[in-house]
């Protein structure tokens, strides 16, 4: 794609009207100038050409180009900010166009680019200084440059468009500088912008070393698996789930440690690689949730929305959609506590992201795609009061328990690979006799399992055992005659569906990886059968 800022063909010459204007004896304005900025769609940025034209006519500031209301308001912000910076607008007709006009633009990120284009038309800065630039930022009425979301995505768009330099708010400069191929310069007010465009050589490039930021990442020592007493089977199930990025459901009474285990799962996942960290940072930046002063997110996300969360908050939404909890948990954990208490609409919206690992939101202006590469961890009580099947404590009638369990649909349960009962702890388990295994020790095994899967799926779409296609499952889960016979007996005894059969094989493959076995053995299958999620009919039959 040609660079809109550096084209010098016949079309460019047609717009250079300063010679015609000077022949009339009224020097002072170039009339037309342009600069690149960027809009946000989904989690990616796209180039927007900001054009400014000054002409004779009634004094007004007109903005066109399929604009949201906050973009149209940029005219008033720019006019006032320029006046307060000592550059009042002339009493002429000023038209600003944001192209392409077929795409709706929203947000206040275009203010700084509009101001730069207008300044060039007024000859306050050299028009050629805007060539090869991408500019974005919000203006206050005093001329201060305010921070904006999505600067990392903007820098990526600049790199893709061949732009070598970006001017962004100072508070966002370190974030944009993560893209090493683009020179990112921060400005704090309009005066700095004018000085920089008059003397480009004075711009100070913002320097950030992403690797050093990752190197400073530290685990959360306050949440370690060594603090969890008892629940050895649930802890083992959590390790298997983390090793293959399998969706994981824990069922047990209140106080059995389900939430404690869930919050410690990020600590046994491998540290983020730079590519993963950049993807997560871009999502949080677009959502406006990047922590102040942080250029790069170095820890895996752990999102735990309340059960009153709506479907829109989970998936993302708005007239111009922004990422929801599902996308914000990409690369990490989405923890849904009290799973049956969530609205049915919120639970059902999980089905597509769990299957396709993306969220698609359709609006009149287009379809927005957000990443959903997360591991679902959920916890629930076995009944409304929480103590079923302990009839000495459970106060629920059988019909109430059946209704409570029936809130989860079978299609949703089909997408959960591992289900584990978390029983009430005994006094001896609570006392914690002996030393429990630490998160660091478990993480070493999980990292080795991830390494094995990386080698296995090199060049393939899948990255983890949980994401294997049916063909890959049959290819990589090699079975001997005894293993095949065991699977046949399990298939007949439990009336497994085809989906449940392949899910069982994927979990068995992960267990084999943890033990560094090339083939899936009988013991791996038996352990995977112990993690088999209940069919909804089985739950209701037990009541």
Residue map of PLM features:
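Inter-Walker segment of RecA-like/P-loop motor cores
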Residues: 295-313
């Amino acid at each position: 794609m040609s660079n809109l800022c550096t084209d010098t063909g016949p079309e460019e010459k047609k717009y250079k009207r300063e010679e015609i204007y000077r022949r009339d004896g009224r020097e002072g304005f170039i009339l037309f100038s342009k600069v690149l900025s960027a809009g946000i769609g989904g989690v990616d940025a796209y180039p927007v050409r900001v054009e400014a034209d000054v002409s004779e006519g009634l004094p007004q500031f007109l903005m066109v180009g399929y604009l949201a209301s906050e973009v149209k308001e940029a005219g008033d912000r720019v006019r006032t900010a320029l006046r307060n910076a000592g550059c009042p607008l002339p009493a002429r007709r000023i038209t600003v166009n944001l192209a392409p006009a077929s795409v709706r633009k929203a947000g206040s990120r275009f203010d700084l680019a509009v101001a730069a284009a207008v300044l060039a038309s007024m000859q306050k800065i050299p028009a050629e200084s805007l060539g090869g630039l991408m500019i974005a930022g919000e203006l206050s009425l005093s001329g201060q440059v305010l921070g904006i979301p999505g600067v990392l995505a903007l820098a990526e768009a600049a790199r893709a468009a061949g732009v070598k330099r970006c001017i962004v708010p100072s508070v966002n400069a370190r974030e944009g500088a993560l893209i090493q191929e683009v020179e990112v310069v921060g400005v704090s007010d309009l005066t700095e912008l004018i000085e920089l465009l008059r003397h480009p050589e004075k711009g100070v490039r913002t320097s950030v070393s992403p690797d050093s930021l990752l190197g400073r990442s530290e685990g959360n020592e306050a949440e370690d698996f060594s603090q969890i007493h008892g629940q050895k089977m649930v802890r083992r199930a959590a390790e298997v789930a983390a090793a293959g990025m399998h969706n994981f459901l824990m069922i047990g009474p209140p106080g059995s440690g389900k939430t404690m285990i869930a919050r410690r799962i990020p600590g046994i996942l491998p540290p983020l690689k730079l590519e993963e960290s950049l993807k997560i940072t871009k999502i949080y930046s677009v959502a406006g949730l990047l922590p102040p002063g942080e250029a790069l997110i170095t820890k895996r996300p752990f999102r735990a929305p309340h059960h009153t969360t709506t479907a829109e908050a989970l998936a993302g939404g708005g007239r111009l959609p922004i990422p929801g909890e599902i996308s914000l948990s990409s690369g990490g954990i989405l923890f849904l506590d009290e799973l049956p208490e969530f609205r049915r609409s919120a639970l059902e919206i999980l089905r597509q992201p769990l299957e396709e690992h993306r969220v698609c939101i359709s609006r009149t202006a287009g379809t927005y795609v957000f990443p959903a590469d997360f591991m679902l961890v959920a916890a629930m009580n076995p009944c409304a009061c929480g103590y079923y099947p302990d009839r000495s404590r459970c106060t629920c009638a059988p019909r109430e328990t059946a209704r409570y369990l029936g809130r989860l649909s079978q299609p949703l349960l089909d997408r959960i690979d591992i289900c584990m009962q978390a029983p009430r702890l005994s006094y001896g388990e609570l006392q914690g006799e002996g030393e429990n295994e630490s998160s660091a020790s478990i993480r070493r095994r999980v990292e080795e399992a991830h390494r094995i899967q990386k080698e296995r799926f090199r060049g393939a779409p899948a990255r983890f055992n949980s994401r294997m296609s049916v063909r890959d499952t049959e290819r990589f889960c090699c079975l001997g005659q005894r293993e095949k016979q065991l699977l046949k007996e399990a298939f007949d005894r439990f009336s497994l569906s085809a989906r449940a059969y392949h899910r069982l094989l994927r979990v068995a493959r992960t267990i084999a990886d943890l033990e560094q076995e090339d083939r899936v053995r009988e013991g791996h299958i038996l352990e995977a059968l112990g993690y088999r999620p209940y069919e909804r009919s089985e739950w209701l039959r037990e009541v």
